[in-house]
Amino acid sequence: MSRPRRRGRDINGVLLLDKPQGMSSNDALQKVKRIYNANRAGHTGALDPLATGMLPICLGEATKFSQYLLDSDKLYRVIARLGQRTDTSDADGQIVEERPVTFSAEQLAAALDTFRGDIEQIPSMYSALKYQGKKLYEYARQGIEVPREARPITVYELLFIRHEGNELELEIHCSKGTYIRTIIDDLGEKLGCGAHVIYLRRLAVSKYPVERMVTLEHLRELVEQAEQQDIPAAELLDPLLMPMDSPASDYPVVNLPLTSSVYFKNGNPVRTSGAPLEGLVRVTEGENGKFIGMGEIDDEGRVAPRRLVVEYPA
């Protein structure tokens, strides 16, 4: 007889985890889920195991709104090793080519400039994108290369930090879907020497405050502290969470009176004053502005429900 499935807490919010190096994003997610004893958890765009930095982890009902963070821009600090190209475009891969580093400062500046603004990027074979239902890195591990279409991305800002010997350090502010490993690999080819990532840190995601990032070590320390004080760990852990609607913070807010919100929560579009003419909106209810879901302005100017918060009984 199988054991009944253990249900976690109905905790809703977003934890800004500072992911450690050498850990997969999914492993980090599972550790946070266990620490919080959450019933559901999901991240908002994986970081490579080599990378560190901000990994927003959505808990509970916040997982419904994680898609809006996938569309947000990101900020990275990267250090490239020049003169070596690897099969994964980072230090976790095998060196496949070595070439001398002979470019000038002027050539470097010109090459960097080609990566600023709107560009097309062909994703690495070592990525989680899918081809015919299978992830690209699964093909790559079998030594198979499949066709990939170039995808439009935007590099809002690319700052040169330093070039010392065989190391090049940059800061890159970019749109969703940007592969920093691919930028470095492509840059190495433009410079004629090859390059791969040896250090990568995600500094920011969307408008989340960097100072709210926490490490796994800090979470574990809080759990131990709660045990010593004989209090529930949630009392120390839950205040670290950002609001569940924070992934959609770029969208305008529409507040519904309680007389209208009951219809909205039952799946019906409602009319209200002060709504924008079109697009997605965050919907709140009542004087306290409680978040109840995402809506979209329909052709008749009504706020139609798109994703609703489910309230579980205590």
Curated annotation (Swiss-Prot):
Q: Tell me which residues this entry annotates as catalytic.
A: 48 (nucleophile)
Gene Ontology molecular function terms on file = RNA binding; tRNA pseudouridine(55) synthase activity
Xref: InterPro entries: PsdUridine_synth_cat_dom_sf (IPR020103), PsdUridine_synth_N (IPR002501), PUA-like_sf (IPR015947), PUA_sf (IPR036974), tRNA_psdUridine_synth_TruB (IPR014780), tRNA_sdUridine_synth_fam1_C (IPR015240), TruB_C (IPR032819)
- Which controlled-vocabulary keywords does the entry list? Isomerase, tRNA processing
Sections of the chain in a coiled coil: none
Mitochondrion listed as a keyword: no
EC number(s) given by UniProt: 5.4.99.25
Residue numbers binding substrate: 43, 76, 179, 200
How is this protein named in the record? tRNA pseudouridine synthase B
The species this protein was found in:
Shigella dysenteriae serotype 1 (strain Sd197)
